[in-house]
């Protein structure tokens, strides 16, 4: 059985989020939580919260046991980009892209 959790419009670029997502893919939930707590990346905190939400969904909605779960799939998609301008010399302006991410985690108890 599976349980899912989604996180939308997180203000971290998808490229940086994927680095963290790749470290916990196909790992046991307990190992993934320990990994995320010790990871020195800004993207680790929102992914840890999302993983805890997926585990809570599995336990409360489907009656699964938390210690038997593993991260079946995790993927990061690109959200809408906020476009800003930075003034530069001689009347120019550089465009600044503030990228957002959408993250989906699926946990399962079947290998």
UniProtKB/Swiss-Prot annotation:
InterPro entries membership: Ribosomal_uL22 (IPR001063), Ribosomal_uL22_bac/chlpt-type (IPR005727), Ribosomal_uL22_bac/org-type (IPR047867), Ribosomal_uL22_CS (IPR018260), Ribosomal_uL22_sf (IPR036394)
CDD domains in UniProt: Ribosomal_L22
Record's GO cellular component terms: cytosolic large ribosomal subunit
Pfam family, one: Ribosomal_L22
GO molecular function, one term: structural constituent of ribosome
Biological process per Gene Ontology, one example term: translation
UniProt keyword list: Ribonucleoprotein, Ribosomal protein, RNA-binding, rRNA-binding
Record keyword rRNA-binding present: yes
Lineage: superkingdom: Bacteria
Protein family according to the UniProt entry: Belongs to the universal ribosomal protein uL22 family.
Job of this protein: This protein binds specifically to 23S rRNA; its binding is stimulated by other ribosomal proteins, e.g. L4, L17, and L20. It is important during the early stages of 50S assembly. It makes multiple contacts with different domains of the 23S rRNA in the assembled 50S subunit and ribosome.
Quaternary assembly: Part of the 50S ribosomal subunit.
Annotated protein name in UniProt: Large ribosomal subunit protein uL22
Organism: Mycoplasma mycoides subsp. mycoides SC (strain CCUG 32753 / NCTC 10114 / PG1)
């Amino acid at each position: 059985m599976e349980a899912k959790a989604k996180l939308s419009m997180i203000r971290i670029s998808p490229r940086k989020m994927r680095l963290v997502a790749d470290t916990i893919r196909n790992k046991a939930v307990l190992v993934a939580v320990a990994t995320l707590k010790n990871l020195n990346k800004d993207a680790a905190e929102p992914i840890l919260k999302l993983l805890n939400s997926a585990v809570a969904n599995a336990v409360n909605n489907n009656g699964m046991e938390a210690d038997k779960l593993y991260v079946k799939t995790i993927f990061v998609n690109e959200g809408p980009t906020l476009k800003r301008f930075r003034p530069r010399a001689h009347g120019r302006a550089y465009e600044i892209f503030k990228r957002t991410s959408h993250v989906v985690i699926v946990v399962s108890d079947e290998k």
